[in-house]
């Protein structure tokens, strides 16, 4: 910027001189961040952008850009994570601040079941395990346990029976689905005979 200095003495004589004034902005922006909570999606992933954590960052000359790091999260990041918001003004001054990013998994397992047929044994009993009903249930963050509403069957259960499979993931999210267990009794009756003597 060019400015002109004009000086007038007591006798009215005037003299002027031009000078260059260089204006610099060395003031960093004010970076302000907020803590947030995000949910993983069904694939076990989540991402954020600077606007998600920015809480009114500002600069007198204007903000040129913002970045946040890290900005992608997965099952290994569950819980509290520290992220850094970097704010750059139009004159390339930067400022940083941190926020807490809490990552949660609220997605229930994806359920796939199958119907099965089982046979009673010679004692009229049969039992199953969850893996016989499960047909590929999955969860992005891993499965912790499988459970069935009914494991044991007897003669009173011959025919179609509805059982419920419960799958719980590593973060306590549970889902259920039904399947049909058909119980069959194909064991022939045991016939016992004895010889007898009769008198005419």
Annotate each predicted stretch with a short phrase:
Residues 1-200:
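Proline-threonine-serine-rich low-complexity tracts
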